[in-house]
């Protein structure tokens, strides 16, 4: 696996995690 592919994959996971966290926070409040 190339470094660029691994980096973009990690970035995508982090972004998705942030979106989910913001969505849950908005839903709870």
Swiss-Prot record:
Record-annotated membrane-spanning stretches: 7-27
Topological type in the membrane: Single-pass membrane protein
Induction: Constitutively expressed, repressed on shift from glucose minimal to glycerol minimal medium, induced in low oxygen (at protein level).
Phylogenetic placement of the source organism: Bacteria, Pseudomonadati, Pseudomonadota, Gammaproteobacteria, Enterobacterales
Keyword Lipid biosynthesis set for record: no
Superkingdom of this protein's organism: Bacteria
Keyword annotations: Cell inner membrane, Cell membrane, Formylation, Membrane, Stress response, Transmembrane, Transmembrane helix
Primary subcellular site in the record, as a coarse category: membrane
Protein location: Cell inner membrane
Biological source species: Escherichia coli (strain K12)
Protein name: Uncharacterized protein YnhF
UniProt modified residues of type N-formylmethionine: 1
Gene Ontology biological process terms, A to Z: cellular response to hypoxia
Cellular component terms per the entry's GO annotation: cytochrome complex; membrane; plasma membrane
